[in-house]
Amino acid sequence: MLITLLTIFHHTSSAQRDPQLREALSTMTKASISGDIEGILSQTSPRIIESMGGIEQATKVTKELYSSLIKYGVKIDSMINYVDMDISKIDGIAYCFIPQVLVMSMPEKDKMAITSANLLALKEDDTKKWTFFNFNKMNQEMINMFLPEFNGKISLPPDLEKKTLVVGKEEVAKTVDHLMKLIDESVKKHH
């Protein structure tokens, strides 16, 4: 648990300058690690929940996702958020991209799975709170559908290679460090 907390707050920056965003991200991270479906959905963009068919359907789908992870012996162990990203605004919507590294335990007790993910933090004028939008499996077209205000105004940050690495437990810290450096380089290159 301590390692998780240390890694969550490992990087400080502009997103950290918005205490409301930092708090919402911390809540989302803790909920994702513990499998707290209600907590996850309370931090999820209403646009996503609506697109899933409302809160009941979103709850059902999210529960199924977590159940299938458990069934396959996979558990999110920690999430490391790269928060050195600028907060921007379009049409009354503040937003910030947050690359993440996820570390998951697997059925093979001596192995861990590590992958990268992308969150989009949104703060819309009508909600007045930060919510999140996981755009991992989305292309620019899908983003434009969910956020027509962004159409033609922003493009998705370049993806890291989307593969899941399986490493021995002793290699986790080194691998996470390497991925965070890749994210850092990618972010700096495209700013």
Residues covered by each model-derived region:
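Bacterial Sec-dependent N-terminal signal peptides
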Residues: 1-19
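Generic anion/oxyanion-binding catalytic loop in active/binding sites
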Residues: 4, 29, 47
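Cleaved targeting-peptide boundary
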Residues: 14-24, 189-191
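Short, aromatic-enriched amphipathic alpha-helices that serve as compact interaction elements
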Residues: 19-35
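Short solvent-exposed beta->alpha transition segments
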Residues: 22, 39-91, 95
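Hydrophobic, Leu/Ile/Phe/Ala-enriched alpha-helical segments that form helix-helix packing faces
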Residues: 32, 65-69, 102, 121
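Exposed beta-sheet edge and beta->alpha loop/turn motif
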Residues: 87-191
